Amino acid sequence: MNREEKKELVSELNSLFGEASACVVTHYKGMTVAELEQLRKGMRAAGASFRVTKNRITRLALADTPFEGLADLFTGPTAIAISKDPVAPAKVCVEFAKKNEKLVILGGAMQGNVLDKQGIEALAKLPSLDELRGRLIGMITTPATRIAGVTQAPAAQLARVFNAYATKEEAA
């Protein structure tokens, strides 16, 4: 890889770090290509990406980004999981690491806050942004639905009383 390609890669990674809200740093030593592809597939499904990068290039790309504090983690065979969703890369990495001991989570960051391995595991237990939005909308619409039901109930009860009275009159 020549100097121009390296500069281009640093620029690409820097913009990727600038747009992301979460990053997880992992060691992948001993994993097969098939296992890495399976992990990448899981990341794509969650809206994240998993990349193996050169440590020096990644450290350079971290400059002037919210993830600058992660530079010390880049030693040995490292890979990054990155996403705009703050929970997605952590969830996929933790889930995959439970099944495959070769994937070691070193740490990560979320919106500028550096997290250790335990922090990433705690982050993985949180619901995703879409799940939280769904819950919030459910909480907002539930009272309106109940109010509509309560306001319609007296009219329905009154209609049933009139109907019962009418059928009683017809029967008599």
From Swiss-Prot:
The keyword Ribosomal protein applies. The gene is rplJ. GO terms for cellular component: large ribosomal subunit. Part of the ribosomal stalk of the 50S ribosomal subunit. The N-terminus interacts with L11 and the large rRNA to form the base of the stalk. The C-terminus forms an elongated spine to which L12 dimers bind in a sequential fashion forming a multimeric L10(L12)X complex. It comes from the Bacteria. One of its GO terms (biological process) is translation. This is Large ribosomal subunit protein uL10. The keyword Manganese does not apply. It comes from Rhodospirillum rubrum (strain ATCC 11170 / ATH 1.1.1 / DSM 467 / LMG 4362 / NCIMB 8255 / S1).
